[in-house]
Swiss-Prot record:
This is Glycogen synthase. Belongs to the glycosyltransferase 1 family. Bacterial/plant glycogen synthase subfamily. Pfam families: Glyco_transf_5 (PF08323), Glycos_transf_1 (PF00534). One of its GO terms (molecular function) is alpha-1,4-glucan glucosyltransferase (UDP-glucose donor) activity. Its EC number is 2.4.1.21. Keywords: Glycogen biosynthesis, Glycosyltransferase, Transferase. InterPro entries: Glyco_trans_1 (IPR001296), GS/SS (IPR011835), Starch_synth_cat_dom (IPR013534). ADP-alpha-D-glucose binds at residue 15. Pathway: Glycan biosynthesis; glycogen biosynthesis. The lineage of its organism: Bacteria, Bacillati, Bacillota, Bacilli, Lactobacillales. One of its GO terms (biological process) is glycogen biosynthetic process. It catalyses: [(1->4)-alpha-D-glucosyl](n) + ADP-alpha-D-glucose = [(1->4)-alpha-D-glucosyl](n+1) + ADP + H(+). CDD domains: GT5_Glycogen_synthase_DULL1-like. Synthesizes alpha-1,4-glucan chains using ADP-glucose.
Amino acid sequence: MKILFVAAEGAPFSKTGGLGDVIGALPKSLVKAGHEVAVILPYYDMVEAKFGNQIEDVLHFEVSVGWRRQYCGIKKTVLNGVTFYFIDNQYYFFRGHVYGDFDDGERFAFFQLAAIEAMERIDFIPDLLHVHDYHTAMIPFLLKEKYRWIQAYEDIETVLTIHNLEFQGQFSEGMLGDLFGVGLERYADGTLRWNNCLNWMKAGILYANRVSTVSPSYAHEIMTSQFGCNLDQILKMESGKVSGIVNGIDADLYNPQTDALLDYHFNQEDLSGKAKNKAKLQERVGLPVRXXXPLVGIVSRLTRQKGFDVVVESLHHILQEDVQIVLLGTGDPAFEGAFSWFAQIYPDKLSTNITFDVKLAQEIYAACDLFLMPSRFEPCGLSQMMAMRYGTLPLVHEVGGLRDTVRAFNPIEGSGTGFSFDNLSPYWLNWTFQTALDLYRNHPDIWRNLQKQAMESDFSWDTACKSYLDLYHSLVN
């Protein structure tokens, strides 16, 4: 099967979050499974700076963006058997960052038009075209409405993956003519209109042949008013083509037996290296080295979406216990300030690190006993899977991908891979935390068994790849 991915970011070239991880990993797994895979990404200035000497020029042409003719260069490299093509336009993509400009609508309108028009020119007409989030969600619409006259594109099947429904690409209807060069008919009849705006995500949901999300629970949640971001009724209407597939993690990169960022290696049969990493981490972040004290890790953006309003409200109660916490992250200044204040009050129990440090993050995943992740909503989440890979048991709010990946501790069977609570409140966070502490202190054999189950969980991309192939084969025989 010929499969083409079009996305706004993709590791290792450009990455701001989980979308970049998916684009960096899933195509590689599909190639391993025997398929011909290509990816189209914007050619950002950070790509030029880091990878420019590995990328070759292929061709260039002009793209009509409304009444304007814009330069489009095509560049190319091959990595892990995947051919990466880059759309080059320095005006749109040399901004020092991926998102956040006032003209993001124009930038990604150009990108989508250029990606479609590039397919013929690079001689890669896919059987299946996989687009991601609102930045590329207009492509299925454009293929069926603007480019339907191109015979080579007639049989292309499309999949839209929603990584985060909050970001929908809502713009003025004038964009249809001014940038995409199409009429207002589909806006006037309500197809593309939502809340009196042009809504790119709605267009993708309606025009893509299949819609996927990054976990089965999130696929269900976005059809509810609580998580549907005002598109729940549209998603309910299209529910027959909506499904969820849990993202994977790189099992080679996140491997406690070989991880180059760790001082000591270990496996599920011998955790002595984990204990040594714990002592090393405690020393590094300025906490007393205490082997018996439960060490809780947090690696996150400090935002309300991640549940930190509830964490801050619970923190004084938690720190009354014989426990240590190491936090790594940045975000809302109010939460940063709160954690910094608590670290001054409890210097032997809380280490607050308001920064981003890849090595420290990896050490937290590997060395801690418990990993706190009480997100208010979480489409998939990767940190909980990384933590489990290293035998660090997650404590999570049962939502989205957290519900799908963490098996809650069952005290009757002594089974599970972590701890979870359903109602996001200080009471239930504290109650679940107490359950975990009791198990850690008084039932070490059961705790050890949970660690082993967590480390044996399969979150590899090879597993996720099989689910995506089932989805693709439902469209392409």
